[in-house]
């Protein structure tokens, strides 16, 4: 997956590795533009769960693994709910719910919500983090019912 680099490689938390230019790229979501090439190549979709590190696979519940049936997307239901400000249990629950309710109407609502969030600059970071916290087994809630349709 093609992506602009906004952090330095190496040890340390995201705040220490995030460059000044990278912070501006992430705030504006311009770091995602190269991923349009991935969409054109068929490796990603416009809408779908955001790609996550392979190391997270072992942490998913059976229900959360539903996200793996779909191509990763530029924008997903979890991002539409608040980008990086969405906590992991809710993010994974929303990704699983999206995988079970695919529709053009839902995709259009997700794209609109993501556009509004990007323009507003909301949700770029999780509270207390330079980006978002890493996923760990402690952050995953038991499987839950999909959120109510609204």
Predicted regions and their residues:
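Conserved small/aromatic sequence motifs within transmembrane helices
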Residues: 1-150
């Amino acid at each position: 997956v093609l992506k602009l680099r906004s952090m330095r490689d190496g040890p340390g938390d995201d705040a220490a590795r995030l460059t000044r230019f990278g912070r501006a790229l992430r705030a504006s979501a311009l770091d995602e533009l190269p991923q349009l090439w991935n969409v054109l190549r068929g490796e990603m979709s416009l809408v779908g769960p955001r790609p996550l590190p392979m190391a997270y696979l072992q942490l998913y519940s059976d229900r959360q693994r539903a996200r793996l049936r779909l191509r990763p997307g530029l924008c997903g239901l979890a991002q539409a709910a608040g980008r990086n400000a969405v906590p992991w249990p809710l993010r994974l629950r929303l990704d699983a719910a999206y995988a079970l309710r695919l529709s053009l109407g839902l995709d259009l609502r997700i794209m609109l919500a993501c556009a509004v969030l990007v323009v507003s600059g909301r949700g770029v970071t999780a509270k207390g983090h330079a980006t978002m916290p890493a996923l760990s087994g402690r952050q995953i809630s038991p499987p839950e019912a999909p959120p109510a349709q609204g």
